[in-house]
């Protein structure tokens, strides 16, 4: 049985993950952490009576030992949470976005120093991970590519972590084959009309109520276009990826970025 604790347990994503952890037969939720709901009964918050768990403010208040901590909070909170967990020699699965490259280098050092493991994934939807892998294959033949990502209007950061990861993967693949994306635009009549850029790859962000999380990678070629799109229709789509990450991270040591690190289970 893998013992887990959950940071951001009472948030929108946290409640969905909490229910899934409780329902899993090989995983046990032993700690629910959320400073905004300190002292409340977690079973009442998520509407499940299978457990009796009091929400605590921080990991320092936990009485139970654990194997894996899961974080879906914000970048500022996650930074402190991750450091504490890794320093304890415990494993970590992180879905929080907005973490900087400098932070990740620090986490990598902590994981190695404490002989533990951390996975940071911009997206836990298996369909989104496969979308990136498919796009990696396509860009060899269609190097003219742009990314459109669409999210709910409460998302704080833009572009999304998934869009950035997609662009990074495509950039590296294009470098490998010495490919370039041609863009003749010289005048933007409105600043930012062509979106943000990661090297030569344009990323366009849409924020609207009614959306959840969506991304389209559009490739253009002579007389044709090819689009790869993923739509997250509810937060439940992330659950299979989160559970897979929890089950796999206990077998690993080191720093991992992106759920694709765990897709080939035979390598674990």
Swiss-Prot record:
Superkingdom: Bacteria
Active site: 151, 155
Main location class: cytoplasm
Gene name in the database record: dapB
The name this protein goes by in its record: 4-hydroxy-tetrahydrodipicolinate reductase
GO molecular function, one term: 4-hydroxy-tetrahydrodipicolinate reductase
Similarity remark: Belongs to the DapB family.
Gene3D superfamilies, per database record: Dihydrodipicolinate Reductase, domain 2, NAD(P)-binding Rossmann-like Domain
Binding residue positions for (S)-2,3,4,5-tetrahydrodipicolinate: 152, 161-162
Pfam family, one: DapB_N
Organism name: Dictyoglomus turgidum (strain DSM 6724 / Z-1310)
Binding sites annotated in the UniProt record for NAD(+): 8-13, 34, 95-97, 121-124
Localization in the cell: Cytoplasm
Alphabetized HAMAP family for the sequence: DapB (MF_00102)
EC number: 1.17.1.8
């Amino acid at each position: 049985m893998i013992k887990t604790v959950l940071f951001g347990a009472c948030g929108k994503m946290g409640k969905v993950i909490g229910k899934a952890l409780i329902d899993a037969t090989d995983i046990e939720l032993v700690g629910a952490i959320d400073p905004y709901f300190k002292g409340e009964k977690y079973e009442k918050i998520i509407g499940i009576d299978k457990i009796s768990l009091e929400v605590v403010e921080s990991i320092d208040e936990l009485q139970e030992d654990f194997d894996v901590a899961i974080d879906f909070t914000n970048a500022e909170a996650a930074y402190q949470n991750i450091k504490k967990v890794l320093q304890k020699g415990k494993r970590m699965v992180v879905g929080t976005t907005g973490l900087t490259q400098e932070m990740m280098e620090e986490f990598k050092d902590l994981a190695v120093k404490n002989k533990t493991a951390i996975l940071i994934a911009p997206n836990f939807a298996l369909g989104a991970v496969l979308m990136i892998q498919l796009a990696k294959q396509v860009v060899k033949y269609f190097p003219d590519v742009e990314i459109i990502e669409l999210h709910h209007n409460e998302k704080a950061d833009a572009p999304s972590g998934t869009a950035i990861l997609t662009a990074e993967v495509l950039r590296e693949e294009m470098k490998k084959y010495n490919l370039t994306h041609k863009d003749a635009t010289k005048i933007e009549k409105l600043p930012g009309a062509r979106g943000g850029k990661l090297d030569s790859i344009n990323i366009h962000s849409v924020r609207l109520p009614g959306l959840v999380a969506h991304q389209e990678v559009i490739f253009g070629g002579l007389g044709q276009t090819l689009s790869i799109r993923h739509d997250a229709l509810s937060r439940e789509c992330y659950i299979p990826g989160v559970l897979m990450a929890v089950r796999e991270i206990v077998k690993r040591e080191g720093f991992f970025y992106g759920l694709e690190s765990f897709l080939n289970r035979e390598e674990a």
